[in-house]
Amino acid sequence: MKKLIIIFTTTILLQGCSNINGEVTLVSENSNSGFNFPYFLFIPEEAKQNKSVFLIVEPNNTGFTSDDFTDHQDQAENLATNDHNLGNFLAHELGYPLLIPVFPRGKENWKIYTHALDRDAMRQKGNSIERIDLQLLAMADNAKKKLVSMGFSIEEKIVLTGFSASGTFANRFTSIHPNEVSVCIAGGLNGLLILPTNSINNTTLNYPLGINDFFEITGNDFDSVAFRNTPQFLFMGELDDNDAAKYGDAYDDDEREIIYNIIGKSMQPDRWTKSVDEYKKFGVNAELKTYRNIGHEPSEVIKKDILTFLRDNLKK
């Protein structure tokens, strides 16, 4: 198992910008508070201090490997400030603040797919990317404190969103920390979800395919009740052909063999149908949708459906 040690320093404590229909702040890393990388906090102009709000959290997805940290920071800032992106769109529509972490995805250690929270990422020890899932929770706690100091009333649980690699991150994160997530929104998922089972057809499913070695990887037992009850909106475009299962950074050869032979070699409809069926069989409180004539994108139609889903579930 490769280990990655990243030395990252910054003299920026808070950097604000207010020309994007809101205010974005780059919050410096704070290892004493539990996170080794900075994050962006976006407060849309629609956010009101006289009502209770949720913190939207969307993991960053650079889309490529790089050992230049500024590449990841630039892409994370775009996620935070561009309303084409899912998290920013929802922040404006709901009037909720948005957190985007700046986790690296290294080129030298390219098999550690941090932005998808893969097995390699979860097994890191003794370096700056150890347990980035816990670092993300620490960032959220830090952001909530800042927002409270500004006069906002913040709900305890987060709204977790993601698309493509960050959608996979969101799905896996929700399986690990279901009690921290009020609602999970995830799409562009390669037709593959973490399945809430130890095995299928006598084939063991370890993380991130299933939950067989969940305690070994996460340090906690899988909370089946909390995961089952957490509202989730999980979607694929019918024309989506972006299949991470083909690549060595997303899955190793053993994982790929299981995916192809047990879950489905064809991303759609076979693999996605199997994932959907497993979630329905387990009784997950999820809306699982396939959108016709849509590829690998969170289209306007999808965004509107997500907005309706969030409004229905966050008022309960």
Locate each region found by the language model.
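Sec-dependent N-terminal signal peptides
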Residues: 4-14
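A domain-start/cap signature at the N-terminus of enzymes
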Residues: 17-56, 63-71, 88-97, 158-163, ...
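Structural cue for short, hydrophobic secondary-structure segments
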Residues: 56-61, 100, 234-235
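Active-site machinery of serine-nucleophile hydrolases
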Residues: 62-142, 275-278
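Conserved acidic catalytic loop of the alpha/beta-hydrolase fold
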Residues: 135-155
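Short glycine-enriched nucleophile-adjacent loop
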Residues: 167-178
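The feature captures the conserved acid-bearing segment of alpha/beta-hydrolase catalytic domains
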Residues: 183-282
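C-terminal catalytic histidine-bearing segment of alpha/beta-hydrolase fold enzymes
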Residues: 270-316
